[in-house]
């Protein structure tokens, strides 16, 4: 490949590298948004063991929906 075409052939990444949510290192494309397989598996483990939870307000659990039958 000629030298002048190498600069034109440079590919821009689709996403900017973001910090890993587990350790803060720059993320890698193979493990996005994590930096490594280890950080990805740590996050998955937290989801599977229930360490992450979406909070629910008390009044939301007793809300009445007109379309539902009791």
Curated annotation (Swiss-Prot):
GO BP annotations listed: regulation of DNA-templated transcription
Names of required cofactors:
Zn(2+)
Q: Which residues bind Zn(2+)?
A: 20, 23, 35, 39
Which family, according to the similarity comment? Answer: Belongs to the DNA gyrase inhibitor YacG family.
* Alphabetized GO MF terms: DNA topoisomerase type II (double strand cut, ATP-hydrolyzing) inhibitor activity; zinc ion binding
- What this protein is called in its record is DNA gyrase inhibitor YacG
List, alphabetically, the SUPFAM superfamilies matched.
Glucocorticoid receptor-like (DNA-binding domain) (SSF57716)
**Keywords, A to Z?**
Metal-binding, Zinc
Cofactor note text:
Binds 1 zinc ion.
């Amino acid at each position: 490949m000629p030298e002048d075409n190498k600069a034109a052939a440079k590919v821009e990444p689709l996403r900017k590298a973001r910090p890993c949510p587990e350790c803060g290192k720059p993320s890698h494309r193979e493990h996005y948004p994590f930096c490594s397989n280890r950080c990805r598996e740590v996050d998955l483990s937290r989801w599977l063991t229930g360490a992450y939870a979406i909070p629910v307000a008390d009044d939301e659990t007793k809300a009445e929906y007109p379309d539902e039958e009791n």
